[in-house]
Amino acid sequence: MNILLISECNKRALVETRRILDQFAERKGERSWQTAITLEGLNTLRKLLRKTARRNTAVACHWIRSTNHTELLWVVGNLRRFNAQGSVPTNTTSRDVLRTKDENPWHSAEVFSLLAAIAGLFHDVGKANALFQAGLSGTGPRSQPYRHEWVSLRLFQAFVGEQDDKAWLTTLSMITSEAEVALLATLQQDKPTFSDSPFRTLPPLAQTIAWLIVSHHRLPVFNKSTELAPNSSEPQLSFAETWLTDHLSPQWNALNHCQIGWTPHEREQNWQFPNGTPLYSAVWREKARKFAGRALKLPSFMHFSQLDQRLTVHLARLALMLADHHYSAGAATVGWQDITYPVWANTDRKTGEYKQRLDEHCVGVGQNALLLGRSLPHLRDTLPAITRHKGFRQRSTHPRFRWQDRAFDLACSIRETSKQHGFFGINMASTGRGKTFANARIMYGLSDESTGCRFSVALGLRTLTLQTGDALRQRLKLDEDDLAVLIGSQAVQDLHEMRKENQQRQQNTPQTGSESADPLFSEHQYVRYDGSLDDGRLKAWLERSPTLHQLLSAPVLITTIDHLMPATEALRGGHQIAPMLRLLTADLVLDEPDDFGLEDLPALCRLVNWAGMLGSRVLLSSATLPPALIRALFDAYLDGRTAWQQAYGTPNTPLNVCCGWFDEFDCQHEQYGDVKDFMVRHDAFVHQRLKNLTKDELPLRFATIVPVSSPSKNADDVYLAVAQAIHPRMFDLHSQHHQQHENGKTVSLGLVRMANIDPLVAVARQLLAIPSPPDTCIHYCIYHSQHPLAMRSHIEQRLDAALMRNDADALWQVEEIRQAIEKSSQRHHVFVALATSVAEVGRDHDYDWAIVEPSSMRSLIQPAGRILRHRQDKQYVPKTPNIYLLSHNIRALRGKDIAYCKPGFESQDDSLDTHDLHQLLQEKEYRHLSAAPRIVQPMSFAKPLSLVALEHAVLGKTLLGLKNKKLDDLKRPPAAFWWRAHPHWNGELQRRTPFRQSAKDEAYTLWIADDDEEPVFMVQDDGPSGWKQSDIARPVTLNMAEGVSAWIEPDYHALYQQLAEEKQWELSWVSARFGEIRLREEEDWYWHPLLGVFGALS
């Protein structure tokens, strides 16, 4: 390809880019180069330019396609040097002709910059106390009864005293050395027996600065401890509005002061300042006068600097924390030190020597916070983006995907409106309709092509995240820098890549996926704006962590939601910074948000609230979204958008969010600022969707309820009874729903789906011991999350191979099925996956039939979606049931009062009158299982509750609360409490309703060091080898009856050997990397290669 390169760099950037470009191309002028180059060479050139890009870099690359046609490929650096076509202006002027600064949409940018700066001056003044200084020198304890930020808060409280905001700010703007004497004289010291809230007496601006000071390491949260603080009472939700002024105490910061080991002298030293505070430093006072003077001259400062301005104060906190991280990591700045003030802020981690003086550190953090705050409004313009992408614009040629074109056109039509008013969209298209790609096209359509497109897709599962990343990369031909996939486990990613490579080697033609009816595009199908981070502080911070760099920089980010959740859920350590910046600079797609457990939904609502507050446009994507969840998420987004419009955009713009609905039948949009009207429109869309589905969809799922009972409630009797109920019915289903080979042998692939691992394994052991009928072989696969990593990946790979049923003849080529037909004498072969919910979400599998243990309505709908998933044709419509639903689950058979739980929605407060599925469901709700019961709310919640009504009722209560119920009577606050009471300044709701709370577990590894050694479990150790043997899981034996075999052979030696050969590694390395499994230490565990790891069964 022939390319033209134009450089508009200045200063040192020009020298650097000339050096690089001269190595690749021939100069055609002072700032232009031309050459013929391969695609690989061009990618290398771009990477080199990006690596050395600085503030003044600006290089455009044009592809000379024909005599009179060039096409812009990419821009590295400053986009403002070029127009959308990559052309350079004829003339430039320094005069502000367009008055662009008069139209700055940020109202509070200078406010949050100055808030961070003033707080930066005070944030560590408490480190001047004698006990902290003794700890730094090594002569005292490393911690103190009261943490330095609490002491800093008390010092700031003393500085403000009884002045109002204007008065104390004026005092700061004229501060002299005498101020410290008055401050120390009025300093309030906390005692173990008494402490009141410092915020009680502070005026609004001072409250904000005080909150920034005390929260610059960790958000205040009530530290509950029956051991250290047995008499302290938990704050009541009904008084949340007064927590700050009436309840806040040192216990919200730490529990150090409650420990009984402190001597009276140490407690005194915590409040003594033998060398004074930084107010003694002339350098500190000079900077304080400057910052306070600027604040007093800013007309909007008082209005935007109150704690109810959520966006402003949280961006101030972000700038402060980032400045603290950045400045603490650097060297000392002598110019900011007063040589007469001998107090230190920190030590060098490597040498242990003193590093930065305290006055210098506070000044440095304040100055850097000011500059960082000022750079935040421009951050979006300096980050990489993609635009003019032909793949997003190309029309679908396959009729099945034409609805994507309508969705894209609608998104383009509301681009400007969504930019001004925000966007909340819902994509409810059915599985197999290309929802993933449609979501990407919708977000691209909403983006301004002049600045490029940036969006994140957040998912709940690693597997689904990897699949989504593959689908988009394959379809859009995006580079790794342009599309980043983050899942938090390099081992899982490695195994996924190896599986993909194996599949490609086995196939004669490249795999093209479900949307590949479109022809492949040319390699150059989009323009990439690389940008260059203007702020060196942010750039330096990002470069310390490749994951953070990817999280913020990638134009398209496919990630497990865990990487974005810290935006609201991280309470300490600055982990909220990167995800907050991502939400500030990119739109958000939530894929299958209803797949999260009930207990995780409040945190999900907080994330959507924060996305609205940070200006993101949000798209929900799922065909099974319950109305209560949609109501809660839209309500959360509305509230967040209100906070955004306070600080950004045209003043007094009414709240009127642009809303969109998409499915394969229709696309609609309207603007709403009210939840009630929004839900009326949503319900109408859903009802029309169901009508369309009734006309369009084939009845491929035909379910019936089968009775199951046990002679006693004893665990062994129950497991045997369930096995005996399942066993004959598998053969019934096989006889009705199988495929026949040309040699007369029959094969069916079935799913037996159970709720929990331990009962699953218990039932599996019983089934494995029951002989098969004559001339029949049953092949079992026990599939759940507690197999070591390599084996789980292998199981999934082999299931993928067998259960991709787009091509009917492909089944006979699958290795396990081909061997069973060729080498076995039996005529009938039943392949059964005994699985938990891992067989559903994120697995694009197609089974012939299923037997399902009920735990919720969702537990019935999800497995049903895997029946005849790929064979959408009239010839496959069943005449007899292909789904059997057990009438009772294992908990019910064991006589538990609460049976439809874990997973499920039943609890002591919301219980069912019966556990018999016959009585819990009407025939129309299960006969042809679909998403309908989940996406339409029942008209009544009168008792006795049905299984469908229970689900909707509990969702409503968890997310929105009950009208007549006192908050403090609830075990957990409803999700809506977050955006109704706005306790954003603390982490109390995050403590009470955490995201993905689980028991503490440890990493173990199934270890094979040599071919002739038996596998053993190992755990990491401090010894010379780094590992030691563990007896965490005891091996068990397994009895397999006649006519029973393994579907997927669990041969760990062969599997590890294959991975070792592919990676060119030792077996021990393979074990360490791919043999991991996480287990809770306090439980008894057992292990078998076929069964995986499981708990005690009776």
Swiss-Prot record:
Misc. remarks from the entry: The N-terminus (1-about 100) might be the equivalent of Cas2 in this CRISPR subtype.
Induction note: Expressed in late exponential phase (other phases not tested); part of a large cas-CRISPR3 polycistronic operon.
Sequence segments annotated as region (Disordered): 497-520
Biased composition (Polar residues): 504-515
Annotated residues for binding of Mg(2+): D124, H216
Protein family (similarity comment): In the N-terminal section; belongs to the CRISPR-associated nuclease Cas3-HD family.
Provenance organism: Pectobacterium atrosepticum (strain SCRI 1043 / ATCC BAA-672)
GO annotation terms (biological process): defense response to virus
DEAD box, short sequence motif: residues: 591-594
Protein name stated in the entry: CRISPR-associated nuclease/helicase Cas3 subtype I-F/YPEST
Classification via NCBIfam families: cas3_yersinia
Function: CRISPR (clustered regularly interspaced short palindromic repeat) is an adaptive immune system that provides protection against mobile genetic elements (viruses, transposable elements and conjugative plasmids). CRISPR clusters contain sequences complementary to antecedent mobile elements and target invading nucleic acids. CRISPR clusters are transcribed and processed into CRISPR RNA (crRNA). Might be involved in the integration of spacer DNA into the CRISPR cassette.
Subunit composition and interactions: Interacts with Cas1 in the absence of crRNA. Probably interacts with the Csy ribonucleoprotein complex composed of cys1, cys2, csy3, cas6f and crRNA.
A molecular-function term among this protein's GO annotations: helicase activity
Cross-referenced Pfam families: Cas3-like_C_2 (PF22590), Cas3_I-F_Cas2 (PF21384)
Biotechnology: If the spacer DNA has a perfect match in the chromosome then toxicity results. Suppression of the toxic effects occurs via mutations in the CRISPR/Cas machinery, or via target deletion, which might contribute to genome plasticity. This CRISPR/Cas system can be used to remove genomic islands, and possibly other genomic regions.
Domain HD Cas3-type: 102-327
